[in-house]
Design a protein with these regions (language model features):
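Short, surface-exposed recognition loops or helix-turn segments adjacent to catalytic cores
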Residues: 13-21, 61-64
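Short, conserved beta-strand element in jelly-roll/cupin
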Residues: 31, 38-56, 86-87
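Double-stranded beta-helix
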Residues: 54-95
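Signature of the catalytic double-stranded beta-helix
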Residues: 1-17, 38-40, 51
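Short Gly/Pro-enriched turn/cap motifs at secondary-structure boundaries
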Residues: 37-38, 95
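Non-heme Fe(II)/2-oxoglutarate
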Residues: 1, 24-27, 63
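Short, basic and Ser/Thr-rich N-terminal targeting/leader segments
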Residues: 12-14, 23, 43, 57
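Short acidic (Asp/Glu) patches
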Residues: 23-35
């Protein structure tokens, strides 16, 4: 499926991980995966597959629509819990 979406013949899996959080755990802050990897390629594909039901009530994944087209993928540090910092850096994503 990824090959079809990316229009390529094959992929190489560089990294996999399982993120396990308790039901009462803190949410992950806004971030981009690519700047934290040990290589720099805007062509890399990151996917997230939920192993349990992911709902708004229990903290589902949320992507900013269009952010993959506008972001520069350079390491800039985390945004932490201050979502406003994200929109200060990328005002075009603010609604």
């Amino acid at each position: 499926m990824l090959c079809q979406l990316a229009g390529i013949e094959g992929i190489r899996i560089w990294h996999d991980q399982t993120l396990q959080k308790p039901a009462w755990g803190n949410p992950s802050s806004w971030h981009m995966d690519v700047p934290n990897w040990s290589f720099h390629s805007p062509d890399a594909i990151s996917i997230w597959i939920a192993l349990n039901d992911a709902t708004i009530q229990n903290g589902c994944m949320y992507y900013l629509p269009g952010s993959h087209r506008k972001a520069d993928f350079q390491r800039k540090g985390g945004f932490g819990p201050d979502v406003g910092a994200l929109f200060g850096q990328y005002p075009e994503f603010q609604t």
